[in-house]
Amino acid sequence: LFNQSGAKYFWESLKTTGIYTFWEVVITLVGGILLALLFNRMTRGFNAMRSIVFMPKYIAVSTSAVVFMWILYSPAASGANQSEGILNYALSLFGIQGPHWLIDANTALTGILFLTAWRVVGYAMMIYLSAMKGIPQDYYEAASIDGADGVQRFRHITVPLLAPTTLFLFVTTFIASMKVFQSVDVMTGGGPGTATNVMVQWIYNLTFKDFRTARGAAVSAVFFVILLVCTVATMRFSNKNVNYDS
């Protein structure tokens, strides 16, 4: 781990994990609150649409990964034809040449994030929606009387009162995304090259494929410390900046 080669792979994996984590957190929080705002205004078809959006959370990660792997590219094909997945075929009908999603180092992580967005946004929407239902309508009515528009009500009422919910989603999503493994292992195996070689994938490869158990254990210990420090820092920040009073 601490020689030149090991340090290089460590920082590459940590960087890839950080990029993936950043985008998963953004997708979860932004997508979740936008969908919650939409569903909070719905009057017809609410239960059906809510179930459809939330359903991906119940599907196993490995199963979802296999489905998205076929959507993004065809593993049964060879060479350039592997990029002709269902999505690229649909794009070709409109004269658009889609990228080589999972076999191009520049787009492989994006392909995995498609799966992530499909799975997590519905869950975040349900959490945000439950919190929104608990906000007293008196606050909005008083703000309307004072002349506040929709954006101002959202900014000064909804966002502050959803801060504890946002913190919960941030912490749980951060931890889950930092230790992402199944979707990466099924869809790319850490490739092409090391483009999607996140930390847990690298630890798995070291321990169970290269049989370098000692190095895998060392990386695991360092990674655990990183997660612990980040989580403690987040909780300390929240204690000072998040208001838990209703």
Each predicted region: which residue ranges?
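A structural signal for multi-pass alpha-helical bundles of membrane permease subunits
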Residues: L1-S246
